[in-house]
Structure formats: structure tokens, C-alpha cells
From Swiss-Prot:
GO biological-process terms attached to the record: negative regulation of myotube differentiation; regulation of striated muscle tissue development; translation
Summary of subunit composition and partner proteins: Component of the large ribosomal subunit (LSU). Part of a LSU subcomplex, the 5S RNP which is composed of the 5S RNA, RPL5 and RPL11. Interacts with NVL in an ATP-dependent manner. Interacts with RRP1B. Interacts with IPO5, IPO7 and KPNB1; these interactions may be involved in RPL5 nuclear import for the assembly of ribosomal subunits. Interacts with RRP1B.
Biased composition (Basic residues): 1-31
Keywords: Ribonucleoprotein, Ribosomal protein
Name the UniProt record assigns to this protein: Large ribosomal subunit protein uL3-like
Gene3D superfamilies, per database record: 3.30.1430.10, Ribosomal protein L3, domain 3, Translation factors
Domain of life, per lineage: Eukaryota
GO cellular component: cytosolic large ribosomal subunit
GO terms, molecular function: structural constituent of ribosome
Protein's UniProt keywords contain Ribonucleoprotein: yes
Tissue specificity comment: Expression is restricted to striated muscles.
InterPro entries in the record: L3_arc_euk (IPR045077), Ribosomal_L3_dom_3_arc_sf (IPR044892), Ribosomal_uL3 (IPR000597), Ribosomal_uL3_CS (IPR019926), Transl_B-barrel_sf (IPR009000)
Organism: Mus musculus
Induction (record text): Expression in skeletal muscle is down-regulated in response to a hypertrophic stimulus.
């Protein structure tokens, strides 16, 4: 029998086995940043929704470069991040076997989009979730018990995490169920953390209070699902020669005769995509503010820069494909991230302490592209397109009734 006379490394990484569909749709934080009591109390993560991608132009200002102020065009991802609502707090005590939940306190009022998450069919349900938990805030005995619970939390707990949910009504989705998550509080003492929660219960927390410009963060998400794929697409194994019997996109040898079973490290066909992944060190290029009123006028210039002063929004012409318009606060991250459009994304503060020039570099954008992402767009704004193309038929039809009325 013939065989190849050279060796080659195996195809595919075994560190992410098993390659099967994720059990959860929202990215789960399995490790939190180390707590530093000297810092003020702050959240360590946030939730957003992937809108799409565009590109930017900026000057690189890293000290030590051979070419100073070199211009670079870079791809960026837009993640829409409406404010989160704080609806509860969980205290954890330290045990020899790790952390254990000690007390859980929910807010007095929970919105329907939050309570929908606890029902499979909200329309047919009796909608009684959290009715007993809410009554504690109204009678005298319940208020006394709540004060005791908060005091016990300050005395015994080592870790404080808040329960937050997203606001689906602010997003261009049909989905009404909010995504709920526990986020750890870092900084300050335990008493200060509990006081932080009490002051912000049932209130909104914006993204700019969690992250800062040019910060390096981690992105946790479930990747885009690809369905059932063959071994060549799933593991990138080499295709067999043209005249191979019964197919080319296969693995010729799947192991020895004995042991009489197929090993776990052998590349096989199966599920590809929809895997839970954590990607480290994503740099924030911009934390943009959503559309808002200022002096009686709507402000939409969250895509303007000091070099490009055009009054334009981050939403490209025609909207982001398969998403729509971004009208809320957003985060612009360098490069691509896991997940498809509208996928919920977990943004976490970095676990590492960064010292590199690239991580500490301050980002100043010169230009943000807002051309249409559906086709080959060449106009940055609708006004620019109309000035170049001239009046369209729909504009002329609007002007006709006005001229007839004046006559």
C-alpha cells in the first residue's frame, strides 16, 4: 500500500470540543474581573445587540512607530446598547466549596418585558410572576424584613451582583422578551455596593457609566449557526484526490482496527456554528450617544468627527441590513465579533491589566463611513444623494398638489 512520505499537523483545534449547539443564546460570563476596593463601585459587564459593520479612518499615534501619524482604514462593529434596568440584587457568601447564593431581593415593580422571560406563553399565562416579591415593599412587615435582608447582606456577603434586563421596546425587533443577566459589582466595600444597588433599583444604567473611550474589553457571544456540515467544511481537512472512490470531501482513515471504536479526536461531520465563544481584547473606538433632544432640536450627529463635521447618524443609508436603524447609545468595537445580526452580545471588562502601547493608545477617528451597506453605496447622507441625483419622482409628486393649491 502507498502512503504519503511526510507528516503534517492535525486539522482542527481540540480545545473547543464538543462542537455542538450552545445550550444558551446569551453569552455567559464564567469569570469576573478581580475586585479592587480602592476603586469606586461600578458594573463589570453590559448587554448589547449586534447591528452591523462599517469602516473608519484614523491616524495611528503610537510612540515608537517608524512612520508617525500613519493613516489606517479599519473595519469596526456597531453594537447597540440601550440602558439596562436594575431589577434586583443577589448576595453571595464564601464557602469552602466556592460562592453560594445567600439572599436575592427583587424590585417592587417589574416591567412586562422582564416578566415575559419567565413564561413560555405569556398570552395564555395568568401573569402572576413576582406578585409575592412585590408585596414585600408595600406592607410594614415586608419593609422591615427587607431592611433585615439588606443588613444581613452587608454583614455576611463577599460578592454582590445586580440583576438587570434589557429594554426591547427601544430596539427594532419583534421580540418582546427581555434578556436578564446577573452582573457583578466591583469596587468599594460590600456596604457601599449594597447602597449603590438601593439607590439605583428600578433605574436605568447607561453604557458610558460602565465603559470608557479607548478601553479594551472582552466580548462573549454565541457564534452564527451554520447547521450540519461535512468534515471538510467543519474541520478544514484536506480533500482527497480526484479519483477517490465514494467521495472526495471525506476522511480516509478514521483510526486503527483496535480499539474498535472511533476516537474523539477524529474529524467527523456534524454541527458547525452556534458555539459559545469568548473573544478577548476588543478595543472601543467610540461610545456614541443615541438620538436626543437638545434646545428643542433633534441631535443626530453621533457619526461626526473633528475632521468630518457632516451632520450624520451612525446608521448608514437604508439602515443596517437585517437590523434597521440605531437610535440608542452604541459602542463601536474594532474588528468583527461573534454572532449574527440582532444577536445579544455580552460585553465584559477585561480580566487582564494592559501595558502594551496598542492597548493604551488613545483613539481619535477622522472619518466614519455611513454609505449604504446594501450594494455599492457612494453617498454619506441622504442630502448628499439628493443633491447629486436631483429631485426624484416622489418629490415632484409632493410638490404638484402644493402648486395646484396656490393657483
Amino acid at each position: 500500500m502507498s502512503h504519503r512520505k511526510f507528516s503534517a499537523p492535525r486539522h482542527g483545534h481540540l480545545g473547543f470540543l464538543p462542537h455542538k449547539r450552545s445550550r444558551r443564546h446569551r453569552g455567559k460570563v464564567k469569570s469576573w474581573p478581580r475586585d479592587d476596593p480602592s476603586q469606586p463601585v461600578h458594573l463589570t459587564a453590559f448587554l448589547g445587540y449586534k447591528a452591523g459593520m462599517t469602516h473608519t479612518l484614523r491616524e495611528v499615534h503610537r510612540p515608537g512607530l517608524k512612520i508617525s501619524k500613519r493613516e489606517e482604514v479599519e473595519a469596526v462593529t456597531i453594537v447597540e446598547t440601550p440602558p439596562l434596568v436594575v431589577v434586583g440584587v443577589v448576595g453571595y457568601v464564601a464557602t469552602p466549596r466556592g460562592l453560594r447564593s445567600f439572599k436575592t431581593i427583587f424590585a417592587e415593580h417589574l416591567s412586562d418585558e422582564c416578566r415575559r422571560r419567565f413564561y413560555k406563553d405569556w398570552h395564555k399565562s395568568k401573569k402572576k410572576a413576582f406578585t409575592k416579591a412585590c408585596k414585600r415593599w408595600r406592607d410594614a412587615d415586608g419593609k422591615k424584613q427587607l431592611q433585615k435582608d439588606f443588613a444581613a447582606m452587608k454583614k455576611y456577603c463577599k460578592v454582590i451582583r445586580v440583576i438587570v434586563h434589557t429594554q426591547m421596546k427601544l430596539l427594532p425587533f419583534r421580540q418582546k422578551k427581555a434578556h436578564i443577566m446577573e452582573i457583578q459589582l466591583n469596587g468599594g466595600t460590600v456596604a457601599e455596593k449594597v447602597a449603590w444597588v438601593q439607590a439605583r433599583m428600578e433605574k436605568q444604567v447607561p453604557v458610558h457609566s460602565v465603559f470608557s473611550q479607548s478601553e479594551v474589553i472582552d466580548v462573549i457571544a454565541v457564534t452564527k449557526g451554520r447547521g450540519v456540515k461535512g468534515v471538510t467544511s467543519r474541520w478544514h481537512t484536506k480533500k482527497l484526490p480526484r479519483k477517490t472512490h465514494k467521495g472526495l470531501r471525506k476522511v480516509a482513515c478514521i483510526g486503527a482496527w483496535h480499539p474498535a471504536r472511533v476516537g474523539c479526536s477524529i474529524a467527523r461531520a456534524g454541527q458547525k456554528g452556534y458555539h459559545h465563544r469568548t473573544e478577548l481584547n476588543k478595543k472601543i473606538y467610540r461610545i456614541g450617544r443615541g438620538l436626543h433632544m437638545e434646545d428643542g432640536k433633534m441631535v443626530r450627529n453621533n457619526a461626526s468627527t473633528s475632521y468630518d463635521v457632516t451632520d450624520k447618524s451612525i446608521t448608514p443609508l437604508g439602515g443596517f441590513p437585517h437590523y434597521g436603524e440605531v437610535n440608542n447609545d452604541f459602542i463601536m468595537l474594532k474588528g468583527c465579533i461573534a454572532g449574527t445580526k440582532k444577536r445579544v452580545i455580552t460585553l465584559r471588562k477585561s480580566l487582564l491589566v494592559h501595558h502594551s502601547r496598542r492597548a493604551l493608545e488613545n483613539i481619535e477617528l477622522k472619518f466614519i463611513d455611513t454609505t449604504s451597506k446594501f450594494g455599492h453605496g457612494c453617498f454619506q447622507t441622504a442630502q448628499e444623494k439628493r443633491a447629486f441625483m436631483g429631485p426624484q419622482k416622489k418629490h415632484l409628486e409632493k410638490e404638484k398638489p402644493e402648486t395646484l393649491g396656490n393657483m
